[in-house]
Amino acid sequence: MLSEGYPLCEVSLSELEAVPAEAGTTKALVRGIAARFAALGHSPMAFDAYVTSTVLPGSGLSSSAAFEVLIGVILNHLGSCGLTAPEIAQVGQYAENVYFGKPCGLMDQTASAVGNIIGIDFADPAQPKIQPVAFDFASCGYSLC
């Protein structure tokens, strides 16, 4: 995978054990997501990708969650796995917690995976309740780009 402005990131999907030296890196996220897909009974397929983003890394704008969801969607699609958006979010959270080494929650991944304006109830983190929030920006004089 090549992300614009970053060096090439290559990860062998046949080697899915956590690599402590990769903690905090893109490789850790990719490997962790692939490992979680495998643990869920899927065979992660190799892929090549060129990635660009307007989300600044480390900006507090959920750049890692957006990246995790991207990788999850790629693997889900290529393998015809059938994971739902909340399940892809949970896969991303697992990768970030266990492989990347950051004890994050599930909100950013869920918001990124589901999209739109939503309400999320995490009373049961294994089965978050997600509700769309109807809002008409134009009727309030706003435009969302």
Task: Identify what each model region corresponds to.
Residues 77-145:
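ATP-dependent small-molecule kinase catalytic core of the GHMP/sugar-kinase superfamily
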